[in-house]
């Protein structure tokens, strides 16, 4: 069956998709209804259970000198060693067994889904709902990715949306490519990040036992799932060298997943078009979407953060949406929230940069 037909079948037959629209207001010259042009943060029909990931245009940085940058030397040393190990791993790729390649790719996609379908679209934005087996899989996959536990990841991401491009944004892209890519992890957080982050409502995360269980046992969990397991499996089961298991299956794979995620914060805030909202920094970046399994449609995502697809086009260069739709077909995901075409077109007409291409 063609992919687009299968997608329609999943969307319509197995579970409901909540369509989000803006209420009609004035009448166009041709007699059609015009969608209300209120700012996103004032719309009434977003998720009733979470609004702390909606951009707040009223927040401005405080005037005055910037605080002194404090380096976290432990992180600097560990990140440097990781990337040196990953570079060495690249040279070892030709010597790896075929199953080690497959293992690395498998681990890459599963851990990436732990971030994209898990920490991001499910727990940060509540853009769909997941039953226990899927939540359990995603919490394990997220631990495999080792990008902070879900609670901390979601807190920082909600702050990133609500206070975007300010000092309260943990990876503020106005501080440059390197800072928004990895530098924000190598220095102490700006005081504004701590101050405004403490005001966010995280009660939904605190009420979820799986999220808090992961947070409680995160250190032993990440050691096992991100480092020990991916190293031991190829070494034990198909006789891969211990060196290749460490530097290719573990260090290189982990570094690639990290940088794919970081490019959403850096490249997708600096390079690309802004067809949905030219007034915000995030861009549409196809290359980022390829590496981050669907997270590169960033101008759309910041315009409509509650859309479970993080894109207008669902499966187009968006493996994460494909995965969520497959889970919906199995009855494990439901209440997927999708913005209506009318609301999208109204936003494009109001704030787009003129580079929108339908389809």
Curated annotation (Swiss-Prot):
Cofactor(s) needed by this chain? Fe(2+)
Which Gene Ontology CC terms are recorded? Answer: endoplasmic reticulum; endoplasmic reticulum membrane; membrane; nucleolus
> A single GO molecular function, which one?
palmitoyl-CoA 9-desaturase activity
| Keyword Phosphoprotein in annotation | yes
The entry's substrate-binding residues are 75, 148, 155-156, 188-189, 262
Q: Where do the TM regions start and end?
A: 73-93, 98-118, 218-237, 242-263
* Keywords for this protein: Endoplasmic reticulum, Fatty acid biosynthesis, Fatty acid metabolism, Iron, Lipid biosynthesis, Lipid metabolism, Membrane, Metal-binding, Oxidoreductase, Phosphoprotein, Transmembrane, Transmembrane helix
Q: Which residues lie on this side of the membrane: Cytoplasmic?
A: 1-72, 119-217, 264-359
Motif placement: Histidine box-3: 298-302
The UniProt entry, under PROSITE patterns, shows: FATTY_ACID_DESATUR_1
Name the residue ranges of motif: Histidine box-2.
Answer: 157-161
Q: What is its main location?
A: endoplasmic reticulum
Q: Which residues lie on this side of the membrane: Lumenal?
A: 94-97, 238-241
Q: Where is this motif: Histidine box-1?
A: 120-125
Q: Domain description from the entry?
A: The histidine box domains are involved in binding the catalytic metal ions.
Which purpose does this protein serve, as stated in its record?
Stearoyl-CoA desaturase that utilizes O(2) and electrons from reduced cytochrome b5 to introduce the first double bond into saturated fatty acyl-CoA substrates. Catalyzes the insertion of a cis double bond at the delta-9 position into fatty acyl-CoA substrates including palmitoyl-CoA and stearoyl-CoA. Gives rise to a mixture of 16:1 and 18:1 unsaturated fatty acids. Plays an important role in lipid biosynthesis. Plays an important role in regulating the expression of genes that are involved in lipogenesis and in regulating mitochondrial fatty acid oxidation.
| UniProt protein name | Stearoyl-CoA desaturase
> By which gene is this protein encoded?
SCD
């Amino acid at each position: 069956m063609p992919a687009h037909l299968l997608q329609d079948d999943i969307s319509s037959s197995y579970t409901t998709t909540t369509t989000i629209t803006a209420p009609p207001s004035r009448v166009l010259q041709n007699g059609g209804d015009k969608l209300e042009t209120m700012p996103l943060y004032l719309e009434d029909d977003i998720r009733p259970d979470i609004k702390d990931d909606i951009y707040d245009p009223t927040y401005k940085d405080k005037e005055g000198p910037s605080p002194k940058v404090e380096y976290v030397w432990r992180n600097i040393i560990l990140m440097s060693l990781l990337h040196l190990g990953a570079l060495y791993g690249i040279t070892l790729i030709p010597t790896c067994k075929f199953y080690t390649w497959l293992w690395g790719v498998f681990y890459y996609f599963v851990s990436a889904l732990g971030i994209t379908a898990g920490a991001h679209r499910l727990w940060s934005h509540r853009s769909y709902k997941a039953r226990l087996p899927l939540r359990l899989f995603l919490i394990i996959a997220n631990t495999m990715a080792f990008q902070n536990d879900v609670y901390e990841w979601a807190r920082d991401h909600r702050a990133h949306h609500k206070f975007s491009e300010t000092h309260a944004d943990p990876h503020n892209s106005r501080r440059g490519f390197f800072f928004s890519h990895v530098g924000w992890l190598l220095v102490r957080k700006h005081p504004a990040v701590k101050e405004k982050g403490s005001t966010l409502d995280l009660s939904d995360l605190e009420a979820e036992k799986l999220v808090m269980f992961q947070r409680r046992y995160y250190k032993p969990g990440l050691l096992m799932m991100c480092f020990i397991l991916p190293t031991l499996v190829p070494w034990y089961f198909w006789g891969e060298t211990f060196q290749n298991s460490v530097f290719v299956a573990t260090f290189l794979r982990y570094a690639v997943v990290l940088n794919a995620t970081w490019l959403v914060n850096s490249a997708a805030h600096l390079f690309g078009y802004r067809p949905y909202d030219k007034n915000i920094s995030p861009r549409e970046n196809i290359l980022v979407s390829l590496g981050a399994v669907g997270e590169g449609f960033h101008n759309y995502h910041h315009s409509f953060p509650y859309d479970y697809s993080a894109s207008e086009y669902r499966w187009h260069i968006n493996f994460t949406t494909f995965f969520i739709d497959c889970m919906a077909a199995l009855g494990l995901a439901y209440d997927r929230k999708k913005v209506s075409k009318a609301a999208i077109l109204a936003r494009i007409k109001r704030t787009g940069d003129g580079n929108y291409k339908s389809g």
